[in-house]
């Protein structure tokens, strides 16, 4: 019971036993992100209970961002990324199974390949597998495989490798599925009077910080310009980062092509062609 006699509110997610996502994976991912809170990182949804089929979290009301909340999120996200990871594709430290992003599989790299740059990781682990999956569902245009193969050659050669933001280590600790729906802003009525952001539903791994920022842009996060400006002020992004946004969006768009079909396959190929 709360101090006023009210029953604390919770939210329980139910998971399919046959799906790729797993409540214990999500709990481990949330815990890994939450480690950065003590250093000023973004607030993460609190896990209250986890089983093989359910995950119970604090109830998280969502509202319109309060004044300054977008800027606070940008600064805090930079610190979450700065918490780092051992290598690209690194899983949460308390997880040894497969990964997932929504209802799609997501590979982890349990042992870091020597001198594995971001571009090679991105093509090998985040693009090529989803080209195969999307093709299995006939979700890509006829030229899709060839377009991604050509882009893969450039990625593997390191042509799009870029430094992390200033505060981040060589590998950032990223949310991994940071679209607007996984970003909640607590309203002024929040129990603690806190009006900042809370992150939910991660696909946490070692990655490039620009991937999370590109995901925020993909489906239109609220007050995106303020979030990005505050992030850049706290942890300056590498030169030319706006030109790489669409490159980092390729993975989630391919995931959508695999899961939902429709126009996502064509969108993925159009984005890829920008980098040929």
Language-model features: locations:
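ATP-binding pocket architecture of kinase catalytic cores
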Residues: 8-117
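Short, solvent-exposed loop/turn segments at secondary-structure junctions
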Residues: 17, 50-54, 61-63, 127, ...
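Domain-level recognition of nuclease-like catalytic cores that cleave nucleotide substrates
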Residues: 65-73, 122, 263, 267-270
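An alpha-helical support segment within catalytic cores of ATP-dependent transferases
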Residues: 85-175, 186-194
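Active-site Asp-x-Gly
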Residues: 116-123, 132, 167-173, 180, ...
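Hydrophobic alpha-helical segments that form the core
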Residues: 246-254
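ATP/Mg2+ or Mg2+-diphosphate-binding catalytic cores
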Residues: 256-276
């Amino acid at each position: 019971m709360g101090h006023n006699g009210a029953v604390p509110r919770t939210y329980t997610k139910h998971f399919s036993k046959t799906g790729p996502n797993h409540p214990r994976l999500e709990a481990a991912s949330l815990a890994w992100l939450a480690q950065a809170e003590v250093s000023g990182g973004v607030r993460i949804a609190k896990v209250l209970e986890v089983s093989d089929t359910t995950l119970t979290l604090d109830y998280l009301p969502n509202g319109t961002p309060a004044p300054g909340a977008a800027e606070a999120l940008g600064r805090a996200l930079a610190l979450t990324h700065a918490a780092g990871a051992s290598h690209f594709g690194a899983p949460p430290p308390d997880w040894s199974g497969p990964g997932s992003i929504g209802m799609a599989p997501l590979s982890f790299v349990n042992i870091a390949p020597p001198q594995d740059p971001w571009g090679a990781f991105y093509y090998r682990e985040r693009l090529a597998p989803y080209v195969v999956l999307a093709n299995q569902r006939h979700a890509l245009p006829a030229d899709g495989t060839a377009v991604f193969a050509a882009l893969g050659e450039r990625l593997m050669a390191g042509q799009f490798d870029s430094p992390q933001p200033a505060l981040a280590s060589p590998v950032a600790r990223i949310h991994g599925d940071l679209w607007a729906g996984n970003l909640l802003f607590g309203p002024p009525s929040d129990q603690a009077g806190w009006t900042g952001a809370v992150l939910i539903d991660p696909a946490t791994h070692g990655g490039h910080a620009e991937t999370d920022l590109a995901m925020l842009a993909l489906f239109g996060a609220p007050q995106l310009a303020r979030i990005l400006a505050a992030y850049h002020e706290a942890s300056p992004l590498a030169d030319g980062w706006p030109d790489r946004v669409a490159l980092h969006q390729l993975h989630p768009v391919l995931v959508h092509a695999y899961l939902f079909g429709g126009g996502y396959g064509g969108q993925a190929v159009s984005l890829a062609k920008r980098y040929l």
